């Protein structure tokens, strides 16, 4: 296994500082957030690619992914991302999946998504880079089985999945081993974080980020299932627990939580890595 940090958990730092923090705490790679606020802008990613590559290489980090919010129908942006990824030597980038909208209905959204994804597949064929959809609540790929229904039409050498098991605690949860049995051929990156549910003052329930070891997701069972499924790629840490987030989430959800003070950067990066490494070695 290899270990990386999603730069979205380092909103306090610029790109150079983020790469140095990741290096300093012993990681193998970095997954760069490519969006408006930080760390690189999608519209400029082809021009920024040499700088992104230089920053990463100076820190001794492999760029394991570019995490974008580009839609499946934005073909010019996808071409730009593919060109940038080739310059950087990055094998994958994330595209934004389709949100579920009951007014449109699942079947219509599904058919449209599969059609667009097939066009993306044709666009990337032979380019040496893979487009990923993230298993994420609020989307039509909120579980491994639903994700397979979409990506299963495509070549796993070109189209893949970011498996985010903590997201399925919020929506889409299923047995860890069964989920990986379904989607394992397409899993190309794994996001690491944890989630808890808490009752609000109004008596309703909402989710919050939590410590890796304390949340509702059983990471020991998840790592065991990943190993048994043959996964040996990157664990990329997207642990936003007590991080001073400066943006809304993937589906525009409020991911801020000021109930506890932010954790210092080095202790959280080193602590998360130590926890996961020990777990991987022990399972």
Predicted regions and their residues:
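A generic secondary-structure micro-motif detector
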Residues: 8, 41-42, 71, 110, ...
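Structural motif corresponding to the early beta-alpha repeats
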Residues: 28, 32-121, 125-130, 167, ...
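Histidine-acidic metal/acid-base catalytic patches
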Residues: 1-28, 53, 57, 84-89, ...
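Conserved anion-binding
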Residues: 133-135
